[in-house]
Amino acid sequence: MSSTAGYRIVKLANGAHSVHSLAHAETFHPVIGPVAEAEALYVRQLRLVKRVERHSGEFVVWDVGLGAAANAVTVLRVTRELGCSIRIVSFDHTLEPLEFALQHVQHLGYLAGYEAPLGRLLRDHRATFEDDRQAVTWDFHLADFPTLLAQPAALEFPKPHAILFDAFSPAKNPAMWTQPLFANLFRLLDPARPCAMPTYSRSTMLRVTLLLAGFFVGVGHGTGEKEETTIAANMLDLISEPLDRRWLERVRRSTSAEPMWEPLYRQAPLSPETWEKLRHLQQFLTGTGFFGKSANC
């Protein structure tokens, strides 16, 4: 279908449309489409409607990988009738996918009704608006995310209640999947504010990376084409199926488990040093981490 500025609209097997990046040779939200993936991976898994409904004050969502705005807009749509205050903080190194998407609203129907605030977001990197009963503040940071997180200014970002993590794959974008990045991300969380972060990958390497960064980690919900994904959180009770010691034993035998310490994609088994750190983590020393004490992963 149509192609401009390095992107094109593609029709998925289920009839939904999405954006394809020619430079990365990857499609945003492939197979089940933008809205279905956002609802399965983020909205339902994070129980966002219930959490926002019960929340007093401003509910903060970090949107890591704005792309064509499907994840953030889906969150706004499902919570717009709750009479709440919500702040979206989006991050990306480019606005080109969103600019392209807004030229193709006829194919990307999830954007309908949000053209005006998204136009302001493009122009001013901020939009404030009323969405049904909801008061929305939407901020955008145009920057290299790994570099941004390492700067002192990142400490001033509003602390999130939920994180939508949706970067291109580690093979195409390794800088977004390193252990130092997730360690910096975890450092920015408020330890007293429950926060969970799902992502589409189920790789052993990612799960080890998140654990060593400080997160509790569990099996995430399936998204149609994937039987499971991954969810990380700063509090164990936010995870319904935490990884257990049976998983830990499988990791020890894996040929692709060592985190990426630098932004260079490769696969390697655990080093002895990483194994020692991993097996002594709190998640595997508590009741949920012992054989037979948690959900089967």
For each of these PLM feature ranges, what is it?
Residues M1-F59, T74-Y110, P117, Q134-V136:
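Rossmann-like AdoMet
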Residues F100-F157:
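S-adenosyl-L-methionine
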Residues F186, R207-A233:
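Conserved Class I S-adenosyl-L-methionine
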Residues A162-L164, P191-S201:
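Conserved beta-strand signature within the Rossmann-like core of class I S-adenosyl-L-methionine
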Residues A175-P194:
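A short glycine-rich, Lys/Arg-flanked "PGG" loop and its adjoining helix->strand segment in the class I
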Residues A5-V10, Q106, D131-Q134, Q151, ...:
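SAM/dcSAM-binding transferase cores
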Residues P160-M176:
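A short SAM/SAH-binding and catalytic strip from SAM-dependent methyltransferases
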Residues A68-V73:
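Glycine-rich SAM-binding Motif I of class I
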